[in-house]
C-alpha cells in the first residue's frame, strides 16, 4: 500500500482501493487497514475493493470476513460500490448480502461460475465481472447493464 506522501495519482484517473483476501494474513494488517481507510476517502477513489473471502488462500475465514465487513461498512458510509473477490465462499457472500441489504452495488470480480450460480447472484442484486476465462452461458444470461469485462 502506498503511503500518502509517496502517491502520485494521475489527475485523469479514478481508482478502487481494498484489501485483497490474499493479504489478510499480513503481519502488518492493522497498518494496512489504516491505510485503506485513508485511501478510501480520497476523491479519486470511486470503488471499494477488491475485497472478499477466499477459502483457499489468506487468513482464516473469520479474519477474512472481519476485514470484508469493514469494506462493506465503508462502502455504505462513503456511497461507493464494492468489488468482491470470492473463492469457494459464494454461499457466505449471498448470505451477507441478504442479511445486510446493502444500498451500494456489489460486483463479483473474475466470475467463472455456472449459469445457476450467476442467476442466483443476479437475483440477489449482485453484478458480475468476467475476465479472460468464463462460462459462456453465464455471460450470456447476465444483462449487459449488470456485466463487466476485465483486463486483468
Predicted feature locations:
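Mid-domain alpha/beta scaffold segments of enzyme catalytic cores
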Residues: 1-151
